[in-house]
Each structure stands twice: as C-alpha cells, then as structure tokens.
Amino acid sequence: MNASQFRGAFTIFNAMHHTEENPWKITSEKNIYDNPWINVTEYQVINPSGNPGIYGKVHFKNMAIGVLPLDDELNTYLVGQFRFPLNQYSWEMPEGGGPQGIDPLESAKRELLEETGLKAAQWTEIQQIHLSNSVSDEWGIIYLARELTQFEPEPEDTEQLIIKKLPFAEAYRMVCNGQITDSMTVAAILKVQLLISENQL
C-alpha cells in the first residue's frame, strides 16, 4: 500500500469510528457585549486536541428569515440595500429577523410585505441554514412564496431599499457570476433552480 492509499484507508477508518459527541470543554465564560439583537460571549475552553484556548461566540436573538417570491411567469424580486458591516451594496431576497417564540412563517409574511409590498397565498419552507457556524449560532429559515398579489411596501425607517423585479433565470445568473453574495439568497436561488430543473415546482 502506497502513502496515498494509506491516507485513504485512514480516512475511511476514521469515518467509520468517528463520534458526534462534543469534544470541546468549557472552563469559564464571560459576557463581552450585549444589545437588543446580539450577545457576544468569550469562553475559556479545552479544545479537541486537549489544549487550553478561547472561543468567542456571537448569539443572535432573532432567527434569520428569508423569502424568495416567485410569480406565475417565474419572475422574482430582489431587494437592494447598502450593508453597513460589509461597507458595500448588496442585492438580496427579502430578509429580516424573526423573534424567537413567534411562528417564523408569520415573520416571513411580514418581511415580504414590508420590503416588497407583496402578499403570497402559497408558502413552502425550502431550506434551513446556519449562516456562519464558526463564530455564531445564527439560524435561518428560507421560504418560497407563490401566488403573489401586489400591495404597498412598508419598509422600516432604517431601510433604504430598491426593489427589482426580474426573471428568476437572471437572478440565477447573478448568483453564478458573483453579483449576489448574500448567503441566504444564494442558498435560496440555488435550491429553487434545483427544484425547477427537477420539475418539482
């Protein structure tokens, strides 16, 4: 057996005998920062190799909610806004925070109406997603909204939005060429493209 074959055998052996138990040990924790949306905690830990270290975790107090609207002609709607943390403009599907303890579908309906003025008669959950699992516990749910009716948008006072209606195929191209980088939007568009290609819509 050569070195390459040995490494492959070792990987298979490990996969057969791996455990999903938590290898991290927390020895202490300290609250670093808190506001109405996030909390930052610093943990003193023993890492999986047995060495001491620190780990910072950002806890999100709201669930991330995303909605991909799709009309009967397979047009979708994107929302453009300047994202403060990135210091750049971003095209995304309608998104927002859903308070814990509230049905996420109700939050999705609210976000869609606020940002686009749309209401949908048909709702399908298409994806659940961790958005940045190395530093945060942010959890997202993505919905596909169909059978759309147009009303007036109701944006929040912190939002300066541009709404763009476009063919879904164009939104898919924007993902493929890097014009859309928001992780929930990328996941939603790729999932819907898969559903379309498999005739599941």
State where each predicted segment sits:
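Short, solvent-exposed loop/turn elements at beta->coil junctions and helix N-caps
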Residues: 29-32, 127-132
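Short aromatic/basic micro-patch
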Residues: 92, 142, 165
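Active-site-adjacent beta-strand/loop module that shapes the phosphate/pyrophosphate-binding cleft
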Residues: 41-49, 132-151
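Conserved Nudix-box catalytic region and its N-terminal flanking loop in Nudix hydrolases
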Residues: 21-23, 58, 66-110, 157
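Positively charged N-terminal leader segments that act as targeting/secretion signals
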Residues: 1-12
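Acidic, metal-coordinating catalytic segment for phosphate/diphosphate chemistry
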Residues: 29-66, 72
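Nudix hydrolase/Nudix homology domain
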Residues: 13-24, 89, 100, 125, ...
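A short coil-to-beta-strand element that immediately follows conserved catalytic motifs
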Residues: 119-126
